[in-house]
Amino acid sequence: MTSVYSIEYQMVIKALREARVAGHITQEELGKALGRPQSFIAKVENGERRLDIVEFVHLCRLVGIDPVSIINKV
């Protein structure tokens, strides 16, 4: 199925997921650190839920990447 989100947004989500996996962080662990259920992370990564800017910054920090570096790539 084709995503309803732009290529740029998909790149952002891909970078977040890759950083999470590279850091050996599970969806469960990331969700808990964010105060959300694992399903929240799964929905974000699968394109079922869109992040707002505050959630994006929090996720970047939790997976150890600089939000500005991701934005500069878009």
Residue positions per predicted region:
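Key DNA-contact positions within bacterial/archaeal DNA-binding proteins
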Residues: 28, 39, 68
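DNA major-groove recognition helix of helix-turn-helix/homeodomain DNA-binding modules
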Residues: 54-69
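A detector for short, charged/polar N-terminal pre-domain segments
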Residues: 1-11
